[in-house]
A protein has these predicted regions:
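Extracytosolic (periplasmic/ER-lumenal) interhelical loops and adjacent juxtamembrane/interface segments
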Residues: 44-71
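C-terminal transmembrane module of polytopic alpha-helical membrane proteins
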Residues: 1-20, 67, 163-204
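Small-polar-interrupted transmembrane alpha-helices in polytopic inner-membrane proteins
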Residues: 25-38, 82-136, 151-162
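Alpha-helical transmembrane segments that form the membrane-embedded catalytic/substrate-binding core
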Residues: 75-82, 124-135, 173-193
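N-terminal signal-anchor transmembrane alpha helix
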Residues: 13-47
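Membrane-interface helix caps and helix-loop-helix hairpins in membrane proteins
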Residues: 42, 68-71, 114-124, 165-173
């Protein structure tokens, strides 16, 4: 019995183990996000998703919108979210695949806002990309049959549904960005997990 209990909680212990390289990268990202906020409102105005500015040629905003924040409170909330998803999912994909997931998520969110949410005139923040990361991690947990896979899937889907049906308390949160980010995360994460499974079968 003790052995079975230890095996049951092994994934939790593994997820929270100190991996110096991964956590150093997390610290660097947190500091960079804070540094961007410290550059002031002029940088935020230059980097944010701004529909009229993008139409005038400011295409870089499609990517940079996801690294600027409204204020310190907004930044701290997103950084806490980043720490949580890092602890849960950092080991699910190699670094190059995570870069592809994040890049794809940023583009998918901005494209979704442009084509599907024309009422959104501006947007800033990393929360949409965090939903990409959560969905990609959940896709991997589903593919690997991790013990928490259904908890993660139901929790994320319930959150997205709650937001889409008017559950979020503040209109400043662009919930469409969360939906587009999660959709991209499930698609890209699912594709990567499927590819990895095929490679493992062929090499077995």
């Amino acid at each position: 019995m003790p052995g079975k209990a230890a095996n049951r909680f092994a994934p939790i212990v593994a997820a929270l183990q100190w991996d110096r390289g991964r956590w150093i990268w997390l610290l660097i990202i947190l500091l960079l996000l804070g540094g961007v906020l410290g550059l002031g409102d002029s940088i935020s105005a230059l980097f944010r998703y701004d529909r009229s500015a993008i139409a005038a040629g400011g295409w870089w905003r499609l990517l940079t919108a996801h690294i600027v924040h409204l204020d310190a409170h907004h930044l701290i909330l997103n950084e806490l979210g980043l720490v949580l998803v890092w602890a849960l999912f950092a080991q699910d994909y190699p670094a190059e695949e995570w870069c592809a997931i994040v890049f794809s998520g940023a583009l998918a969110i901005s494209s979704g806002l442009w084509w599907l949410s024309p009422h959104v005139s501006w947007y800033v923040g990393a929360s949409g990309v965090l939903h990409t990361v959560m969905a990609a991690g959940t896709a991997n947990h589903l593919a690997t049959r991790a013990w928490d896979r259904w908890i993660l899937l139901l929790g994320l889907c319930a959150k997205l549904a709650w937001e889409q049906w008017g559950g979020h308390p503040t209109p400043l949160v662009v919930v469409d960005a969360h939906l587009y980010g999660a959709g991209c995360g499930f698609a890209v994460g699912g594709a990567l997990s499927w590819r990895t499974a095929i490679i493992r079968r062929r090499s077995a």
